[in-house]
Amino acid sequence: VTLGIHCSFRFLCQEITDLAIEEVDAELLDNLVLWKYNGGDATIREFRALDPEMREEVLNFLEDFSLYEELTVGEKQYLLVHGGLGGFTPEKRIEEYSLHDLVWARPDYQKEYFADTNLVTGHTPTQTIPENDNPGYIYKKYHHIAIDCGACFPGGRLAAICLETGEEFYSSDNNG
């Protein structure tokens, strides 16, 4: 009897697993694995510890996020994305980029993507940008503004930039 129950259970789980695999596309699965690798476990653990009301507030807050922002500040145009513009072509409209293109792709900081728009990115610590003379600080070149100043690295810090004035703001570095 135990063997029969065990076999039935395994068979049922296999059907559910097969169904789940058919319904989950490869890109979503890759994104979930990458998210888990980059701290998703801690996020889920902390989220589950919240009371239902606070969970709802967090979800409502997250629903307001966008994958990109197009801004005009004074006379200047800006495109803000977390990562980059994966699969960039000049003809491609911003709406055509996937979540992966905008969140996980890294831009080529030696390339000017737009002559009339500044591309503001995070995700790539400025310490890892080739030919960067000032690692750990905001990088500006070729109409790029890279604001990830590698807070996770020795000597790294959090950074922000005021697009109206160009003024840069930094936390103290993580060494002190």
Model regions: which residues?
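Short, charged, surface-exposed secondary-structure boundary motifs
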Residues: 11-12, 155-159
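Acidic, His/Gly-enriched loop-helix segments that form or flank divalent-metal centers
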Residues: 24-146, 150-156, 172
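Conserved glycine-rich phosphate/nucleotide-binding loop
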Residues: 165, 170-176
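A short acidic, often aromatic-flanked loop/helix-cap motif at beta-alpha or helix-coil junctions
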Residues: 8, 152-153, 176
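Core catalytic region of metal-dependent phosphoesterases/phosphodiesterases
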Residues: 1-27, 31
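Short acidic-glycine loop/turn motifs at beta-strand connectors
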Residues: 72-75, 162-167
